[in-house]
């Protein structure tokens, strides 16, 4: 054939002309799997591979943690951390998480939270951040700090808004928070009595930090401070003013309890809605857990004593985004966006989270929040 007519790519591979290997007759060779004895990693190893040696030490730490020997596990993890290469990111994350969990079990919560905060700052994808947030949740739960526990759950939900189990945990946390805040208000009222030594009547609201879930002023507005005159003509007036403020405080305690119950109820309803949407996709034990949880929620909802139209409105608000988005969340995508952009996906405060999810409900059912400050100014 003329070389000028030869088509590029028209040549044959040499393998076309090669003979195929003959098949061996008889049964195939048996597969011999490597069997490891229990606790095989405790045996002496003469491996020159540093990574393998550190991996064996990690297995020892994991077993000690499993046995609840947290001090021993912490020692193993710490010895690995000192020798681990700075480029071995995967094992470094695992080891640091192990250290944090051991420290939490040993009562060293602040050290555990420092490690968790460091891991959060270095997270580069949603999987890493999710793991760190669950770690923080475990530490705060061990610390029995309700507000921090709730904030951890809020951050998890902002990252995975269609996870029903985190919404359920948030609802339970709100249920526990309500009585705690109400009791704190009552206790503060008893401890901080009104005094006239500085000729002012001081507020007995508890101190509210920047990240408090329900913020109360440390003192009443300037206009609400009542001057206490020494003469008896103003005594009756001052007593009446004190009584009015105490009544307002009692109403405030009741409002705090109702607000937290409303948030708990809304979170339970959101949980139930998400479970109902995922129910057709589930079978076996997953479906059993789903149905059992829905029944438990139904039983707890009876204790709220909210009217049916109230529950319907809450369900409407908490389910606004579900029909369009739930299908996209069945197989969530792992987003690798870098630590800075990843931070933007997570809520920065409880106020921001609650404003997003509960503002419509609160405005409809809790008008007392704005009314309270108005009443105080009128009394002044």
Swiss-Prot record:
Record-linked InterPro entries: DUF5588, TPR-like_helical_dom_sf
A Pfam family this chain is assigned to: DUF5588
Superkingdom of source: Eukaryota
SUPFAM superfamilies attached to this UniProt entry: TPR-like
Gene3D superfamilies per record: Tetratricopeptide repeat domain
Protein name (database record): Uncharacterized protein C8orf76
Gene this protein is translated from: C8orf76
């Amino acid at each position: 054939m003329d070389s000028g007519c030869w088509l590029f790519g028209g040549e044959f591979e040499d393998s076309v002309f090669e003979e195929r290997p003959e098949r061996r007759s008889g049964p195939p060779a048996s597969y011999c799997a490597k069997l490891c004895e229990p606790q095989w990693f405790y045996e002496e190893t003469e491996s020159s591979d540093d990574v393998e040696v550190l991996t064996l030490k990690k297995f020892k730490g994991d077993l000690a943690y499993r046995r609840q020997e947290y001090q021993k596990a912490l020692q193993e993890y710490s010895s690995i951390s000192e020798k681990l290469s700075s480029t071995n990111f995967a094992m470094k994350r695992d080891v640091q998480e192990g250290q944090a969990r051991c420290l939490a079990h040993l009562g060293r919560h602040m050290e555990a939270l420092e490690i968790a905060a460091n891991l959060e700052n270095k997270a580069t994808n949603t999987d890493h951040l999710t793991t760190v947030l669950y770690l923080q949740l475990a530490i705060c739960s061990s610390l029995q700090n309700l507000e921090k526990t709730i904030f951890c759950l809020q951050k998890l939900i902002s990252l995975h808004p269609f996870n029903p189990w985190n919404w359920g945990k948030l609802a339970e946390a709100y249920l526990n928070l309500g009585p705690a805040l109400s009791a704190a208000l009552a206790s503060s009222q008893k401890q901080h009595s009104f005094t006239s030594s500085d000729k002012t009547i001081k507020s007995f609201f508890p101190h509210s930090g920047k990240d408090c879930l329900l913020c109360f002023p440390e003192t009443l507005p300037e206009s609400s401070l009542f001057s206490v005159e020494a003469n008896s003509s103003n005594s009756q007036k001052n007593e009446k003013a004190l009584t009015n403020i105490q009544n307002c405080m009692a109403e405030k305690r009741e409002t705090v309890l109702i607000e937290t119950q409303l948030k708990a109820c809304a979170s339970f309803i959101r949980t139930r809605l998400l479970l109902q949407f995922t129910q057709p996709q589930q079978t076996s034990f997953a479906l059993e857990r789903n149905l059992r949880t829905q029944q438990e929620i139904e039983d707890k909802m009876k204790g709220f004593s909210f009217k049916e139209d109230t529950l319907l409105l809450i369900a409407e608000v908490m389910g606004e985004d579900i029909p369009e988005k739930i299908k996209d969340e069945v197989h969530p995508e792992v987003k690798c966006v870098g630590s800075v952009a990843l931070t933007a996906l997570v809520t920065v405060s409880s106020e921001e989270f609650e404003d997003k999810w509960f503002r419509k409900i609160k405005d409809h059912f809790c008008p007392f929040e704005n009314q309270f400050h108005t009443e105080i100014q009128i009394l002044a």
